[in-house]
Amino acid sequence: MSTEPSRTALAARLRALHVPGDPLVLPNVWDCASARAVADAGFPAVATGSAAVAPALGYEDGEGTPADEMLAAVARIARAVPVPVTADMERGYGMGPAELAERLAATGAVGCNLEDTDHRTGAPADAGEQAEYLAGLRAADPDLVINARTDSFVRGAGGPAERLADAADRMRAYLEAGADCVYPIGALDETAVRAVVEAVDGRPVNVLSWPGGPSPARLAELGVARISFGHQLHQLLQEYFTGLVAAVARGDSPFPKD
């Protein structure tokens, strides 16, 4: 008899970690080694980041990775760690909600991040269509933990006030459609974070931790329920590796001196 937790149990565990004021912190990963490092450090869940996975696989972010390859990467990561895994699936890679739910379940992931940018045009998708997609995904997999990202702050029209209003409308629509958490990427300073948290009346909000932005501890004080890091840890590691390679190219040792 298997002692492994069921997919339903893993999903419930992930969902329960989204607590406003006591956020789930997710250093985003891109392969099995980075996923194991996060799990070994004691983090209770692992999240992939498409902008880190894509270059690790040799592709551009923005759905440049073939769906089969992205899903295969997610499956490898889910097998590598004992904690719940949530996968960044961009806007679904052209799959309908039922197909996405089925293929995600096959990887072992119990959560997903879905954004509302139409990568064919680079413009925000219609909010109603995105909400309908999320509702279909929820119907196809009641267990799946859905983190619904809105790109209003980074791709929306108008000034800061108009973008905040659009983000608020989208977040509320996505929660009503069945999302568990909303992710207004680009809400970086305290004023914006406070505004998006207030806009959804205490429902879980994911915020991107960014250089120069509020610390994870401060984001917790602002009522955030989930903190992610996008591609930034992968980028820092790549910059470090590039420096090591440059040292070797100069004829120097890449190793720290005693």
Where are these regions (language model features)?
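Structured C-terminal subdomain patch of bacterial secreted/periplasmic proteins
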Residues: 235-255
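Non-transmembrane, interaction-prone segments in cytosolic or luminal domains
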Residues: 71, 88, 247, 256-257
